[in-house]
Amino acid sequence: MSAWESILLNLPEVAGPTQKHLSFKEKLKWTLLALVVFFILGLIPLFGLGDNALQQFEFLSIILGAEFGSIISLGIGPIVTGSIVLQLLNGSGIVKFDLTTHEGKRRFQGVQKLLAIFFIVFEAIIFVTMGGLAPPAEFAGTALFAQLRLLLIFQLFLGGLILLFMDEVVSKWGFGSGISLFIAAGVSESIFTRAFSWIKSPNNPDAYIGAIPELVRSLTIGDAITAGLMLAALLATIAVFVMAVYIQAMKIEIPLSFGRVKGYGIRWPLNFIYTSNIPVILVAALLANVQLWARLLQNAGRPWLGTFSGNTPISGLVEWVAPQNIVGSVIRGSLTGSDIAHAAVYILFFIVGSVI
């Protein structure tokens, strides 16, 4: 056995259960434990952090299962990126793995974990050195500034490793995968907050963060446009939720016949969405990474992927792969042909990426 194979086959990992099937109670316990730890990690701020240039990307933090400014600021980004890179290399034949054997699967998982660790280190360094998560500006040019940078990188690396192993815990001991769980947790928290929060918006002291309180407020003062926007957001959320539950429950029966037993056949039920939401998660995380990299490159004076004006992408690749609020534009009466073109490109990219 070569040194490389020895490293791959002896990487630290979460031990799987000894029994073949875990009880529902056992899986629920580990899933809830991982969820609680995830929320606690999101409340631990990075020590030595000054300027948090990423805090404006709230939507991206939900997709990446991250909490910018906390120890899990990297989220699932490195894990997803490593998985995408390895699948592309394996699918194109550049790197070949025999996934039909146990050893081949172990090598594939080992390389995938190494790539995830590499991207954890790489993204931690980039986030700090390119100004996304930087130490206080008053320490710039001092030895303390460099030390705080190293400390921030270490904290991000530690948080990324914890999420990596928590993903393994959920995959082996809980329900589904950690990636799906962390994203679902962030989405659920965001939906609850944006629907019911009575806290005033920091951008508009007269408005509420929650859609329901803001809908009531806008109706009482006769603000039809805001009321329409809030109502559209609530109805769209309910419609998507109902549609997702219905489609997820759909099954397609595949007829099977047996050559050795003439006249005998069965129907094998398969989920209509056989791959679940994993392809969508991977593409969404990829696009989120593009937007993050575009912002970091712009901060570094190299807007190779495009530029932002505030929180809005206004040029380059990032402008075309950013989601468009078409419904909001229609309600406001500001819909343009450019908005439709951008939305079409975004949808096409999402569909093609998910299928591939």
What are these regions (language model features)?
Residues 1-356:
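Core subunits and conserved enzymes of cellular information-processing
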